[in-house]
A protein has these predicted regions:
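Flexible, solvent-exposed loop/hinge segments and secondary-structure transition points
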Residues: 1-145
Length: 145
């Protein structure tokens, strides 16, 4: 997954940090590309943590009009939870295999479109590895379980 995400980042000419987290949001692997921001590892981890823990793509928290973290909605202020680790912006995606969230992938370093493209490359790599073995992997930007 990380190799696919970084390969896509190279194609896009952007320095990314990739975090793969388990279902509890704890990092299994963090890789910061040469030249990527030093803040990337923490931000990518926050995104992977949030996506795994809440079983949804992080950008859905603030997507109008019903994003739950928007002012006036039920989860407004949630980004201050978990000592500020709760990410409500683009770049975090749950890893869903056979309908179950098994982890999260977080990207930091590009703009939202670039982070999403790299994350989708990571998810597609997992799908390519697991689908021949009879497993299904959800590969899309807007994931909410």
């Amino acid at each position: 997954m990380v190799a696919a995400a970084t390969a896509r980042a190279i194609e896009l000419k952007v320095g990314e940090t990739v975090c793969i987290a388990d279902e509890g949001g704890f990092p299994l692997l963090i890789e910061r590309m040469d030249g990527a921001r030093v803040t990337g590892p923490q931000i990518a981890w926050n995104k992977a943590f949030t996506a795994a823990g809440h079983r949804r793509s992080t950008h859905l928290f603030n997507t109008p009009p019903i994003g739950p973290a928007l002012p006036g909605n039920e989860a407004f202020g949630i980004q201050w939870s978990f000592e500020g680790r709760f990410a409500i912006f683009v770049g975090g995606f749950p890893i869903v295999v056979d309908g179950e969230v098994i982890g999260g992938v977080g990207l930091s370093g590009g703009n939202g479109e670039q982070d999403t493209s790299c994350a989708l490359a990571a998810l597609q790599a997992l799908a390519d590895a697991l689908e021949p073995r009879g497993h299904s992997v959800l590969v899309r930007a807007d994931i909410k379980l």
